[in-house]
Amino acid sequence: MGPVSPQHTSTEPVRLHRWDEIALEKVTEMLSRKIITGEREMLTQIYLKRGCLVPNHSHESEQMTYVLQGALKFLIGGEEITVREGEVLHIPSWVEHQAEALEDTLEMDVFSPIRQDWLDHTDDYFHK
């Protein structure tokens, strides 16, 4: 049996991204981010200062959080989960969660589908 051809071929070109060429968006005094989007997923670099609190929220997107430096404490369903350097946390769609930076932290988030609220700046839960 030969290879199966895809039913959908992307209209997007292949793109190479360089983090140092992507603008840093200051979301709050405690949190900044860089965003790369594809057709159906989003990759972000997030910089959180120690003590930064991302308030409780949920979203349609499935989320993978990979801590590169530092540590984040998540509160999910009444359970505390600490994610440290080199660890990845998977958060399914619509699961309410909040996070606190236990130290200065650099992490990457992958979202699918794309977080449109981040692109159009309607992610006002950061400012509550």
Describe the role of every protein-language-model region.
Residues 68-69, 84-85, 103:
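A cytosolic small-molecule/anion-sensing beta-strand core signal
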Residues 47-49, 59-74:
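Short, conserved beta-strand element in jelly-roll/cupin
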Residues 78-93:
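Short acidic-glycine-tyrosine-enriched beta hairpin
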Residues 42, 64, 71-73, 80, ...:
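Structural motif
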Residues 93-117:
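Ligand-binding loop in jelly-roll beta-barrel domains
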Residues 1-40, 123-128:
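A short, N-terminal "cap"/entry segment at the start of jelly-roll beta-barrel domains
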Residues 34-37, 46-47, 54-59, 100:
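Short histidine-centered beta-strand/loop micro-motifs
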